[in-house]
């Protein structure tokens, strides 16, 4: 949101000197904001009014999630039949972990592009007008990479679909041209502004941060064990069947994720659709091969899984766990003026700086690692992100030590047992935990 609003205000997709992601994510959201006259919103400092700032982007993300479900249905319908399509898309729609596709994330934006590229490549094998569909497929995949670099791993499954149709290298080249050219806008823009060294530094920095993919596997297994078991069982079946379509979608991304960069739970989003597809095919296979003889028993099992998933998701989405975030933001807006430096994460800084035009609000609290605080008084909104990042530099811990807690906003998430399913999903909502408002004098 911060970068989209910055693009809306300045017309420049590049924010500062940090090159961590390409531009299409903020371009897409900024376009929606512009079409809905978002800049004309004039919220008050009341916490309820502040929530209205997220209404338009959240509706947009919800529509993208609906589109994802439709695209999954069409892909599976063509490849595996209508029964598998119904099961796969239904699992994607109702299982608890798929709530993440409604969040304002780059992965949520690129998912329809990836699914659209796969669907167009499949359609290209069933028509005489192959070249145009292949080019459009490459364009969508190029835009996905222009949203977030890891999307490049999807080229393996799309190129395989295109090549196996006519066994022509020329078809693959048609796909690769837009796929490669569109993401090149990012480094070319950096070269234009004589910032290619910063671009290299930003890209390399992300590859040097690392943790084990087992951490992500473990976290996924905890927060949505049903999807984890069904999805990986479906992938295991795909291995036994040598289903190249599913394996070329799943394996390259997992290899990339395990070898490069820092992994978080939402990085798994790229392969959630293929896991739902694999799970749907697995559930259909149980009936197809008469593993369960009685149709009524099979239907009962399927309905049981879907109802269980729907109920679990409903138990999650009926709760508002973000109220303390807006209360904390409202408190800061109403109690501190421009003469105070406010250190906070990008979750809040864009509202303070771009919407309410407050001065002395760095885009990220980590700015104090590179630039000194110039005001006499400093306020810190200490949330889970700040606590996790304390190891990034001594300045963050020093700022914490030199401030005292003025106000605390407890999150509603504390009222749930996050060890009990489906509330295990609450573990992925660190922003909704305790937020401290701390202030100090001469924090340097």
Language-model features, listed with the residues they occupy:
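Membrane-interface transmembrane helices that cradle and orient dolichyl/undecaprenyl
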Residues: 78-83, 117-134, 144, 166, ...
């Amino acid at each position: 949101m911060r970068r989209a609003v910055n693009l809306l205000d300045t017309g420049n997709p590049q924010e500062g000197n940090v090159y961590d992601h390409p531009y299409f994510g903020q371009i897409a959201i900024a376009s929606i904001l512009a079409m809905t006259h978002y800049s004309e919103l004039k919220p008050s400092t009341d916490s309820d009014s502040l929530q209205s700032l997220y209404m338009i982007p959240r509706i947009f993300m919800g529509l993208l999630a609906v589109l994802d479900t439709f695209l999954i249905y069409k892909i599976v319908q063509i490849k595996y039949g209508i029964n598998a399509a119904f099961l796969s898309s239904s699992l994607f729609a109702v299982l608890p972990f798929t709530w993440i596709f409604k969040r304002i994330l780059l992965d949520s934006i690129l998912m329809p592009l990836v699914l659209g590229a796969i669907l167009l490549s499949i359609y290209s094998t069933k028509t005489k007008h192959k070249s145009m569909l292949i080019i459009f497929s490459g364009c969508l995949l190029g835009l996905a990479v222009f949203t977030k670099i890891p999307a490049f791993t999807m080229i393996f499954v799309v190129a395989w679909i295109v090549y196996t149709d006519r066994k022509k290298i020329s078809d693959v080249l048609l796909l690769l041209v837009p796929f490669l050219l569109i993401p090149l806008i990012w480094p070319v823009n950096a070269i234009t502004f004589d910032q290619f060294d910063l671009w290299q530094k930003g890209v390399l920095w992300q590859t040097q941060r690392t943790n084990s993919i087992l951490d992500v596997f473990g976290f996924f297994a905890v927060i949505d064990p049903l999807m984890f078991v069904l999805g990986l069982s479906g992938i295991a079946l795909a291995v036994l069947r040598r289903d190249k379509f599913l394996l070329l979608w799943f394996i390259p991304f997992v290899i990339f994720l395990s070898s490069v960069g820092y992994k978080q739970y939402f990085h798994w989003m790229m392969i959630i659709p293929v896991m739902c597809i694999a799970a749907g095919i697995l559930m259909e296979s149980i009936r197809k091969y008469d593993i369960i003889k009685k149709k009524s028993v099979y239907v009962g099992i399927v309905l049981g899984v879907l109802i269980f998933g729907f109920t679990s998701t409903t138990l999650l989405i009926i709760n508002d766990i973000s109220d303390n975030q807006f209360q904390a933001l409202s408190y800061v807006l109403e109690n501190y003026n421009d003469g105070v430096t406010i250190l906070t994460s990008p979750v809040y800084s864009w509202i303070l700086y771009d919407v309410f035009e407050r001065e002395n609000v760095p885009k990220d609290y980590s700015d104090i690692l590179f630039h000194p605080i110039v005001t006499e008084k400093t306020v810190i909104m200490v949330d889970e992100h700040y606590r996790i990042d304390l190891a990034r530099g001594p300045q963050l811990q020093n700022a914490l030590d030199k401030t005292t807690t003025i106000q605390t906003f407890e999150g509603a998430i504390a009222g749930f047992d996050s060890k009990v399913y489906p509330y295990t999903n609450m573990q992925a909502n660190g922003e909704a935990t305790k937020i401290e408002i701390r202030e100090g004098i001469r924090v340097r």
